[in-house]
Amino acid sequence: MTTELENLSEAEAANELMRLARQIAKHDRLYHAEDAPEITDQEYDALVRRNAELEAAFPHLVREDSPSRKVGHAVAASPLSKVTHEVRMMSLDNAFADEEVAEFVARVRRYLNIGEDEAIAFTAEDKIDGLSCSLRYENGKLVRAATRGDGQVGEDVTPNVAHIGDIPQELTPLPLAGGAGGGPLDDSGSAPTPDPSRRREGKWNGPAVFEIRGEVYMATADFHALNARLMDEARAEADEKDNAFDTAKVRQFANPRNAAAGSLRQKDASVTATRPLRFWAHGWGAVEGDVPGETQVEVVEQIAAWGVPVSPLFRRCETLEEMLAHYEAIGAQRADLPYEIDGVVYKVDRLDYQQRLGFVAKAPRWAIARKFPAEQAETTLENIDIQVGRTGKLTPVGRLAPVLVGGVTVTNVTLHNRDEIERLGVRPGDRVVVQRAGDVIPQVVRNLTPDEKRDSFEFPDTCPECGSEAVSEEGGVDVRCTGGLICPAQRTERLKHFVSRAALDIDGLGEKTIDQFFALGWLESPADIFRLKDRRDEILALEGWMDKSVDNLLASVEARREPDTARLLLGLGIRHVGAVTARDLMKYFHELPALRETAEKARAGDEEAVVALTSIDGIGSAVVEALGDFFHEEHNRAVWDDLLSEVSPPRYEVETLDSPVAGKTVVFTGKLETMSRDEAKAQAERLGAKASGSVSAKTDLLVAGPGAGSKLKKAQDLGIEVIDEAGWAEIVAAAG
């Protein structure tokens, strides 16, 4: 529950700003660096708006790492080289209502000291959902293309954009056949087009340097065709190798934006060449020479005349009423456009006004994005099913009468948990409003028939799969099955997790294969995977299996007889034991029997065992409790013993290099710009150092990035050596 601003204490506001900074940074990373968003645009925007409200109410609490100071996200570890933008690629502030657009216009007038009776024009264009890209032309020739990254540093994608037909390798100074500005939406929706019959002769006469900025995107039809082609190619490859085909293992892009980002950011440009990418321009960056125009309209028209596409819906608006009308007109066409958009961008037209208005921390004062609401539709909730996940969590899933939302037919929605069902008051038979935004799972946002006489949905208190008691965690909203590995749903999901890429990474055992083998009674526990060699003839008799595919599967299984110990521990699916925690545990214990013995002692109340576990950096009471509970359950112990009778995990050791930090304790603080926190920790371990999360008298070295706060001060007070990220990179490079 969000607390009203007037009821917040200063300490509460500071804590909330800290949480928001971390949340927004996480979602920025997922969206910009990993192309894998977890929340809708609307949910993200709500976090940003709350942060802005808090900073306005408590300006003295604005943090160094505030989202209001950042653009995009630092470039993650990538094979693509980094590019520093000469002129930062900024973000845009957002508006969500007509009143906010009106306030933007009024704010521009106040800043420029322009009265209501004096005309001021704006441009308006649709905001395409793509990947920002900057194209640097020198003397009319393309010399470099770079992604936005964090606005200051992006990735070099020059070889990749050479395969995008919309991006010319050389600009041609063509005059326009017709203008872009002013008129209403025309029937064709065409952009300003060059007239080849009026080609200028002679050498390039434009600016010596001109950076065109815009969006790389993928048309909706091309996106669907690409996913279909990737599926067909994977099926053909499986047939050629006589492997069983598993659709679950085929890479499918979630939406056109992710497809565009994933296709452009390829180390091998020949992959990009096979992807149907497009581009259009909406602005510019660094310029050496004269800007070819005095208004936004004039420069955009000149860019189009040079042969670079611009938005077909780009217009000049003389009044606020025209701006709002153009937003409505674009919104009315949204479902029929051949590409996905998420709003309309307004910019002050006169460039001298833009220069006077300048920028705030991460956005220009002279532009704003009016966002569209998430796409919604009405339908009937026909049923509510309960699914049981790998960790026993009971998740309600709504089954819908099929409905088209945002160009996609939706039949299922997540209802999250018992509390969400109670909040919405939904029951089978209700009419509901369904919302879909981006690649996030569709969700019910409103119940249209809450007052109709119908029995409330009763959330089960027993597991629908095994009949074990289902209980709520103290202080939590989730309901979980207590059956553990005796629950068939948990067993199949845990088997899938066990063979996943993060765990044992066994090729040939996809989700459908595991479901099939489980139904046949061949797979009950992880150890059964290593007994599949005894069922070769039975597998071969199944439809779709050939000698080669069976042999490939069995060879992949046999290759994991001596698995990495931390991966094996991760594969068991113990609650709260992820990849990092599994590595941390095995670095301390080295062998699995030692871990089990300590966990069992800790559950029995042995204080020394509890101290041993919690002394491991990153291991808290939740992990200790989860380990104890796992080994306390008799069936889990049987599964563990059975598995270790089939595999022989070697003693876990971390290979280290000779380095000046070997044997020392290193702490990382502040914003790391060239690596993630996990990467930094892994580097420290490889150099023989211990990476700690807190500064103490035992700390030997602090690596401080931008925004370093209390840890830096404490280190300085204790006389601990402090270096920046570049200094750390030198240590890593020197160690080889």
UniProtKB/Swiss-Prot annotation:
Record flagged with keyword Transmembrane: no
Keyword field: DNA damage, DNA repair, DNA replication, Ligase, Magnesium, Manganese, Metal-binding, NAD, Zinc
Catalytic residue positions: 127
GO CC, one annotated term: cytosol
PROSITE patterns the UniProt entry points to: BRCT (PS50172), DNA_LIGASE_N1 (PS01055), DNA_LIGASE_N2 (PS01056)
Biological role stated in the UniProt entry: DNA ligase that catalyzes the formation of phosphodiester linkages between 5'-phosphoryl and 3'-hydroxyl groups in double-stranded DNA using NAD as a coenzyme and as the energy source for the reaction. It is essential for DNA replication and repair of damaged DNA.
Protein name per UniProt: DNA ligase
Lineage: Bacteria, Pseudomonadati, Pseudomonadota, Alphaproteobacteria, Sphingomonadales
Gene behind this protein: ligA
